[in-house]
Amino acid sequence: MKFSSLIGHSGELLQLVRSSEKPADSVIDLFFRSHKYLGSHDRRFIAESTYGTLRHLRKCESLLKRALGDHALDMIPEDGFLLLVVTYLIGIEQRTAFEVTDLQPAVKSGKLKPHIGSILQSLSRPQDLEPTELVERIGEEYSYPDWMVRRFLDQYGEKDTVLLCESLNSQAPLSLRVNSLKSSVEECQQALRKEGIATERTKLSPF
């Protein structure tokens, strides 16, 4: 599937999740059931992009707001969710190899299309978040509500609050056990590598 289509599907799914009262995993499962033409690689990209954007939503919203500037007035809701996914991929995942042609076909607003290049350039430049107040700065950096950050600071102090927020908002690793009667660790790693999945041996149980 073309990259523009993957981005478009990711933006569509993010909008569905944000507008639904159901848990995100239920909405995503229903989305894939109704889009059976999506291959395994497409599904993985769309799911990871959606979950990642949700995990870093507050930071992505802040970065996108500054990148858009006055062009925010030209944006319709569908394009907003689309650009949030793009912001996550560029600002969080550091995927800077975006071309205007990757994004323009998925953008629906005719007024916004001519400015996609400048928006991508702005997102690709290193940006410091604006808030100078400690609670807001930590909240935006790690996408936590201010009230929760304030409570963490009261209990743990600044250093441990930053470590806690960073840890809790990181994607959890997945551990797999290999049945050595049927396969070896190397064979499993090779099979996963062919699917584009990077693995490493665990430190506590390497065999």
Please provide the spans of the model-predicted regions.
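Class I Rossmann-like S-adenosyl-L-methionine
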Residues: 1-207
